[in-house]
């Protein structure tokens, strides 16, 4: 029977080649420093036998990570519960909302600021079908509106383009994170050390690495790792 790994192998080899080139061209890099318990989205590549392959979330185990370190030790995460797995608190999609909702709020405020500034400081115009949305935003943001900051957001007419660009990035993130709406389990029998270059960010607004499991989850992971790897 043909393994479905062959379907993913060409794309992985292409990505791996680009990572090697990046390694040669940028030998000295400064990396993001991750906290213990951080959740990161990792491309584990295509591997042999029952070694984990493809893209999975993972829990960072390092206690003292550094921007100078290019590696992390992690536990991959799966939606399937196995013998040596530990359930993580809260689904990843729910964790992402604490970071994505403030972005949505900022988009709403910037959109209102641009429209209100144009209406009151430049020239009134008919909003048409957008009038109802504007009135809702006026109720929500009218008290915190500031004409000086609104002028900066308006940015000589290009502010709306920036808001639309941010909106698209947020939609991409929402579509990405809504896939991870199931209870997840840290695979304690698949502990791995990876390069930070394997971490995937959808765009610069992605909270990957900022999401975190709670201390109770980390304690249960510690207990399971001791059970698996340390002598009594």
Where are these regions (language model features)?
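C-terminal terminal-subdomain/extension
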Residues: 1-14, 23-24, 32-35, 85-232
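Short coil-to-beta transition motif at edge beta-strands of beta-rich domains
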Residues: 33-46
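Short, charged beta-turn/beta-strand-edge "cap" motif at the junction between a beta-strand
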Residues: 45-51, 65
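Short beta-strand-centered aromatic/proline hotspots
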Residues: 53-64
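Short aromatic-glycine-enriched beta-strand elements
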Residues: 56, 69-75
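Short, conserved beta-turn/loop elements at beta-strand boundaries and strand-helix junctions
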Residues: 63-69, 80-81, 193
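Enriched for short, Lys/Arg-rich terminal
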Residues: 75-84
